Amino acid sequence: GCRKRGMVVLARTDPHAVHQDVFDAHPDWVATDPDGSPRRHWSMPEAWVTCALGPYNFEFMTEVHREIVRRYDVQGIFSNRWAGHGICYCEHCRRNFHDATGYDVPLRQDPEDPAWRAYSRWRHDRLLDVARLWDDVISGTRRGARYIPNSGGGALSSLDMKTLAGMVPILFADKQSRSGIQAPWSSGKNAKEFRAAFGRKPI
């Protein structure tokens, strides 16, 4: 198998969506629009998009990751779509953001708006907090195992890639170009951006 071939085995999670049974049990885990409507998945209408900044990731997915590395002989967990999609207006985001900054969650991405600038920083810090939490739980449960976040945005990422580089041993950039409008050389451009931030770490 993989071990005999000297391969590293990673599990994969995808925290960005849940099915109806999860929504029924925990509607507060789902991202919401400004009017409070829960957010349906754009390509799977039977699924719901989760909030990346609240208890679904910080509590539930933390325990999922702990269970995976406790029960299975894997050397890490890679998460796809872990950083959320768009601004979330769920009860947790509204309360936590207001408590942290004194602002309401902004309705639009306006760099001139101090609320948007505060939200961008708050979201960034929350995402790095959950990545650190998952890495701590995974490495603390199975020695040598690590958390690997998918970070395919390169220079266009909303995350500070230099900070992320200091947190992880390797980076994967999931570049699928499903729209058909990305230049063929964009993956190479991403690799150069990651190399600039990561130094000699593998990408």
Residue ranges of predicted features:
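Aromatic- and glycine-enriched glycan-recognition loops and surfaces
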Residues: 1-7, 58-60, 126-133
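Conserved, mostly hydrophobic/aromatic
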Residues: 2, 9, 61, 68, ...
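Hydrophobic beta-strand scaffold residues
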Residues: 6-13, 147, 203
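Active-site-adjacent "subsite" loops/lids of carbohydrate-active enzymes
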Residues: 11-72, 107-120, 132
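Substrate-binding cleft/loops of secretory-pathway carbohydrate-active enzymes
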Residues: 20-21, 78, 85-89, 127-190
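Short, hinge-like loop/turn segments at secondary-structure boundaries
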Residues: 27-32, 95, 164-167
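Active-site-proximal loop/short-helix segments
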Residues: 78-115
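Active-site clefts of carbohydrate-active enzymes
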Residues: 190-203
